[in-house]
Amino acid sequence: MSYKLKVKGQYIKDLSFENQNSPQIFVMISKTPPEINISVNVSSVSLPVKAQDQENGQSLDNKVEPLYEVTLQVNAEARVGTTVAFICEVKYCGVFSVENSDASNGEELSQQDMRDMLLISAPSILFPFVRELISRITATGGFPPLMLDVVDFKAMYESQIKQNAAEQNDNGQHTEK
């Protein structure tokens, strides 16, 4: 495959950190380590943008450069018993293009390869930035830095496909009595 995923930009789209039970929670976590629950989600949307003429900067109405926004959402919640220690929610996005590095071969990118690039490769590029961001936010919030484990986005994607197929089978096999 001669296609490359190119990062056009990346940014924080949404960020929230809640530490509503301070300062009492700091006494609680000094005695009992918090239980931390983490969820990770990935989504992508197409962002059609008109291509620009390189020489004069004018819009080329007949060409569209396909761009994609990939969102990596990570939610982390720490609890001591039933008391919330903190909630950290991050939506971190990247704008990507998929470019043919060998335009002479005329090879089309399959939908499956495109999904792999956008839902496996792109979040793998974004993840280190999200991991660092969450580590700094939790430390700034007065907690030990939360270091996220590496995420296997391929396994996550395959699991989601299996779950969707199972849900479709359940919906398709429903019979009325």
Curated annotation (Swiss-Prot):
SUPFAM superfamilies according to UniProt: SecB-like (SSF54611)
Gene Ontology terms, MF aspect: unfolded protein binding
Name listed for the protein in its UniProt record: Protein-export protein SecB
Phylogenetic placement of the source organism: Bacteria, Pseudomonadati, Pseudomonadota, Alphaproteobacteria, Rickettsiales
Function per UniProt: One of the proteins required for the normal export of preproteins out of the cell cytoplasm. It is a molecular chaperone that binds to a subset of precursor proteins, maintaining them in a translocation-competent state. It also specifically binds to its receptor SecA.
Keyword hit for Iron: no
Transmembrane regions: none
GO cellular component: cytoplasm
Family membership noted in the UniProt record: Belongs to the SecB family.
